[in-house]
Amino acid sequence: MRTFVTGGSGYLGRNLLSALVARGISVRALVRSEEAAQKVQALGAQPILGTLEHRETLKEGMAGCDVLFHAAALTSARATDAEFHRANVLGTETVLAAARDARIQRMVHVSTEAVLADGRPLLQVDESHPLPKRPFAGYPATKAQAEQLVLQANGPGFTTVVVRPRFIWGADDTAFLPQLIDAIRTKRFRWVDGGRYLTSTCHVANVCEGMLLAAERGPGGEVYFLTDGAPVELRSFLTLLLETQGIKAEVGNIPFQAARAAAHLGESLWRALVPQARAPALRLAVYLLGREVTLNDDKARRELGYAGRVTHQQGLDALRQAGPAGQGAMPHRA
């Protein structure tokens, strides 16, 4: 198998590159800078310098490859709707066009459970749960659009599969955990409703397992949730994550309704005071971390043979041994 990976210098991408190389699989990875090129080269992948906007560069990089893993996305809380659209929708369109040009046979697209976010709890939902008619934030809206583009592209000679992991975590995290630690240290973090509700999670190694299985045996035009298995209480899990870094989660509490109102007010004030910049997506953060979000991944286990082999305890032990999180952090757009 010869593979091409977008987002290879991001947190998930780096782990995917390592997993592919460990299996003796040839890997090329799209990177946007020389620094990122050095990182992916150190992992054993061949860097391809370019962006999601350059169809010819993508086509040349994919030439001779069998499988495409599309993990690149813009996730920044302060990106504009136009920036989200350019990266997540137009970027995916360009990747699909280049894949067809290069005659890629199979594509695995990394999406997110956030495409379902509508402000209400998500309780053990499966892949049949409908997308909301009116997404309320640029990130989930454009990720949902990208999903649909990928699924519509499925056909003879080009098999496309979508995976939706929830709450990716693990050692070498340069995304969520460093941000959580910063919020704790700067006293910007509060438990919403005490954090006493359930969440699904997915260790980064388990995400990679699911992606590889989707590439090997996933039927075209399908979507798969990926999780660690049984959901956990959010407060307990975040407390354990922080303890691996020697940090105690001694923070206050805020009711959900107050958190939602504060987020709405914060976004409104930002738009009024800093109209030239996009307000941070505070409401989305409250909805994704302040409500129960639990997913049913039976479909992936049944159809792909997915097992989610890394347990919470194994992942926490590895985090503890790895030392401080966030070293060598990369930008939000991988």
Curated annotation (Swiss-Prot):
Q: Name one GO cellular component term.
A: cytoplasm
What does the record give as EC number?
A: 1.1.1.394
Which residues does UniProt mark as catalytic?
A: Y139
Which Pfam families does the record associate with it? 3Beta_HSD
Broadest EC class? oxidoreductase
Q: Which GO terms describe its molecular function?
A: aldehyde dehydrogenase (NAD+) activity; oxidoreductase activity, acting on the CH-OH group of donors, NAD or NADP as acceptor
The record's InterPro entries line, in alphabetical order, gives: 3Beta_OHSteriod_DH/Estase, NAD(P)-bd_dom_sf, NAD(P)-dependent_oxidoreduct
The UniProt record lists the keyword Oxidoreductase: yes
Reported phenotype of the disruption mutant: Mutant accumulates aurachin D and aurachin C and does not produce aurachin B and aurachin A.
Q: Which UniProt keywords apply?
A: NAD, Oxidoreductase
Give the catalysed reaction(s), semicolon-separated: aurachin B + NAD(+) + H2O = 4-hydroxy-2-methyl-3-oxo-4-[(2E,6E)-farnesyl]-3,4-dihydroquinoline 1-oxide + NADH; 3,4-dihydroxy-2-methyl-4-[(2E,6E)-farnesyl]-3,4-dihydroquinoline 1-oxide + NAD(+) = 4-hydroxy-2-methyl-3-oxo-4-[(2E,6E)-farnesyl]-3,4-dihydroquinoline 1-oxide + NADH + H(+)
Keyword check for NAD = yes
Name the GO terms of the biological process aspect: steroid biosynthetic process
What role does this protein play?
Answer: Ketoreductase that catalyzes the final step in the conversion of aurachin C to aurachin B. Catalyzes the reduction of 4-hydroxy-2-methyl-3-oxo-4-[(2E,6E)-farnesyl]-3,4-dihydroquinoline-1-oxide to form 3,4-dihydroxy-2-methyl-4-[(2E,6E)-farnesyl]-3,4-dihydroquinoline 1-oxide, which then undergoes a spontaneous dehydration to form aurachin B. Accepts both NADH and NADPH, but has a preference for NADH.
Family, per the entry?
A: Belongs to the 3-beta-HSD family.
The molecule here is called 4-hydroxy-2-methyl-3-oxo-4-farnesyl-3,4-dihydroquinoline-1-oxide ketoreductase
The species is Stigmatella aurantiaca
UniProt lists the gene as auaH
